[in-house]
């Protein structure tokens, strides 16, 4: 697989470029797919996992790697952590707004105060976000919800290691997670408990 960088994308700031590459390329989507195909290939045991789409798993992993990439960037670590938290808060807010729109029937005027709190005040911007959320329900939930599920799996894996007096490492968890996916989080949690 290859990752194409459009010339216009290279003009973006280094943080956005670095985190986008982490999300889309290495260690995000591209790495996850290459890992699956190179370690398991497609066989009778996993053909359904190969054919089916598990957006919470794949977007959860990609967002996890994106947010993790902030800690590997050069520069002021406090500032990088602030940027990471800002990204996470934005995604969380978009999930909340998505739920408010599709569950509670929230309107543009209902969501504008939430967006204003994070600096989005221009009516055209608020309308664009509202329109996107209306037309693409659940989009941000697969990212942020998948990420939160991944963090639950990570904590479950860590506790399992501790209960069995095994040394926990992020590397071991990452390998376990990638070897057991793509799949539902229910199945991954069951695999952790049965490992």
Model-derived features with residue positions:
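Long, His/Glu/Asp-enriched segments that create or flank divalent metal/ion-associated functional microenvironments
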Residues: 1-195
């Amino acid at each position: 697989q290859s990752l194409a960088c459009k010339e216009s994308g290279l003009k973006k700031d280094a943080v956005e470029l670095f985190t986008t590459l982490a999300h889309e390329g290495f260690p995000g989507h591209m790495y996850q797919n290459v890992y699956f195909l190179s370690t398991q290939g497609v066989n009778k045991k996993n053909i359904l996992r190969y054919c089916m789409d598990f957006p919470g798993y794949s977007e959860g992993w990609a967002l996890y790697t994106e947010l993790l990439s902030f800690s590997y960037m050069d520069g002021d670590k406090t500032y990088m952590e602030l940027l990471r938290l800002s990204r996470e808060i934005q995604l969380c807010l978009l999930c909340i707004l998505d739920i408010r729109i599709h569950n509670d029937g929230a309107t543009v005027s209902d969501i504008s105060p939430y967006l204003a709190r994070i600096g989005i005040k221009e009516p055209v911007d608020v309308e664009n976000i509202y329109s996107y959320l209306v037309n693409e329900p659940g989009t941000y939930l697969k990212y942020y919800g998948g990420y939160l599920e991944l963090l639950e799996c990570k904590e479950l894996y860590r506790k399992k290691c501790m209960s069995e007096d095994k040394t926990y490492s992020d590397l071991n968890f990452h390998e376990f997670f990638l070897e057991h996916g793509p799949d539902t989080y229910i199945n991954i949690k069951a695999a952790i408990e049965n490992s």
